[in-house]
């Protein structure tokens, strides 16, 4: 991630703005300061962390913007305005950095859902985008939705789509399991998962699992198809076993079949003479219904100044685990007389991180997490823990 190291930080007087970058307020604890930053339509934190002989300034990994150019620009402006004696830097704002809003990248699920219509294919972990762009060109009347956890991949593929005049794609940074959980039932024609990380020694980290397979069955249309392509026979066999739990699925199994398009990983494996396995699955016959989304209802929580002092004094790094969700209180920061709380929460296999701003009331510092049931339960638990565990 882009960053730089400085020996000295000048006094930070906010708000401060320059060249479409705004630094609005900051919160801090003993080790870290967070600068609330806006670049055009996106908000995120810059993080200042004490280090040996200076400070490291970088983007907060849980709020980083969808376009790396936004972060690079914010770092440049902060360095010029507030830092002295730069020790080193690992970022550079290039003239061709993708800073302007692109129609190919959506920033959140609400924006995504508003743009979904017609036939939809999903590619999970599209990487360099070769297969995704190929599908888009071959199927101009289909919307190709790419989900990827790495920001640089989104930026790269958006640039390629623009250069190649491909207009039927949408890209989002997300965990694929979380994405599937917010889609309507029977709304997707195909789901591609090509060369996922096998996680041989940590199978619990695989995207494939019973819940994932159920979600695939729910969102796929009648005779919609899931397609896995992998060089790992263990992963291939594991995936087959997961889908065999359905009543009457149909499968197509293939080995070392050449497709019209080859990813860079596939090219590498073929040079090493590795076997390539394909698994297609359809005919799930799954009874499905769309989930009813509830609200977080944070308006029911109110704080006095004394309450905030008690929360700050009694704060502990604790984790609460329930049957289908967890809640982890990670860090607390002071912002004038108010507090900023960092928590991780949600389902065990699709957790989220967020910052909560506490003054007279409580609210999300950035956009709301999506309203899946595990997140709703975790936030309800948080409201109770604030009262009981932190003695307000």
UniProtKB/Swiss-Prot annotation:
Pfam families: Methyltransf_4 (PF02390). It comes from the Bacteria. S-adenosyl-L-methionine binds at residues 123, 148, 175. InterPro entries: SAM-dependent_MTases_sf, tRNA_(Gua-N-7)_MeTrfase_Trmb, tRNA_methyltr_TrmB_bact. Its EC number is 2.1.1.33. Keywords: Methyltransferase, S-adenosyl-L-methionine, Transferase, tRNA processing. Pathway: tRNA modification; N(7)-methylguanine-tRNA biosynthesis. The keyword Transmembrane helix does not apply. Coiled coil: none annotated. It is an enzyme of class 2 (transferase). One of its GO terms (cellular component) is tRNA methyltransferase complex. Substrate binds at residues 201, 231. It catalyses: guanosine(46) in tRNA + S-adenosyl-L-methionine = N(7)-methylguanosine(46) in tRNA + S-adenosyl-L-homocysteine. The keyword rRNA-binding does not apply. Gene3D superfamilies: Vaccinia Virus protein VP39. GO terms for molecular function: tRNA (guanine(46)-N7)-methyltransferase activity. Catalyzes the formation of N(7)-methylguanine at position 46 (m7G46) in tRNA. Belongs to the class I-like SAM-binding methyltransferase superfamily. TrmB family. This is tRNA (guanine-N(7)-)-methyltransferase. It comes from Campylobacter jejuni subsp. doylei (strain ATCC BAA-1458 / RM4099 / 269.97). The gene is trmB.
């Amino acid at each position: 991630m882009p960053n730089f190291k400085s020996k000295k930080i000048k006094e930070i007087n906010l708000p401060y703005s320059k060249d479409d970058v705004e630094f609005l307020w900051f919160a801090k604890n003993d080790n870290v300061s967070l600068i609330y930053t806006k670049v055009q339509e996106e908000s995120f934190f810059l993080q200042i962390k004490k280090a040996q002989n200076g400070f490291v300034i970088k983007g907060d990994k849980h709020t980083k913007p969808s376009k790396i150019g936004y972060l690079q620009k914010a770092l440049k402006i902060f360095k010029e305005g507030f830092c002295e004696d730069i020790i080193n830097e690992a970022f550079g704002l290039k003239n061709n950095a993708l800073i302007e809003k692109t129609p190919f990248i959506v920033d959140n699920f609400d924006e995504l859902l508003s743009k979904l219509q017609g036939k939809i294919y999903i590619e999970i972990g599209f990487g360099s985008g070769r297969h995704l762009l190929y599908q888009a060109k071959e199927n101009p009347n289909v919307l190709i939705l790419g989900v990827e956890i790495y920001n640089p991949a989104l930026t790269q593929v958006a640039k390629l789509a623009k250069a190649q005049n491909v207009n039927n794609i949408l890209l989002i940074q997300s965990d694929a399991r979380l994405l599937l959980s917010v889609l309507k039932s029977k709304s997707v024609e195909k789901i591609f998962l090509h060369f996922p990380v096998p996680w041989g020694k940590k199978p619990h980290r695989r995207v494939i699992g019973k819940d994932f397979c159920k979600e695939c069955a729910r969102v796929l249309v009648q005779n919609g198809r899931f397609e896995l392509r992998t060089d790992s026979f263990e992963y291939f066999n594991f995936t087959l076993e997961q889908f065999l739990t359905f009543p009457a699925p149909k499968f197509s199994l293939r080995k070392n079949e050449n497709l019209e398009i080859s990813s860079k990983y596939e090219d590498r494996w073929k040079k090493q003479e590795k076997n390539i396995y394909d698994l297609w699955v359809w005919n799930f016959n799954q009874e499905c219904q769309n989930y009813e989304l509830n609200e977080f209802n944070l308006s029911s929580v109110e704080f006095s100044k004394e309450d905030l002092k008690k929360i700050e004094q009694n704060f502990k790094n604790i984790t609460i685990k329930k049957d289908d969700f967890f809640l982890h209180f990670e860090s607390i920061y002071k912002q004038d007389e108010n507090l900023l709380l960092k928590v991780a929460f949600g389902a065990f296999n699709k957790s989220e991180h967020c910052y909560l701003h506490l003054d007279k009331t409580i609210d999300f510092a950035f956009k709301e997490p999506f309203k899946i049931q595990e997140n709703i339960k975790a936030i309800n638990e948080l409201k109770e823990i604030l009262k009981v565990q932190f003695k307000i």
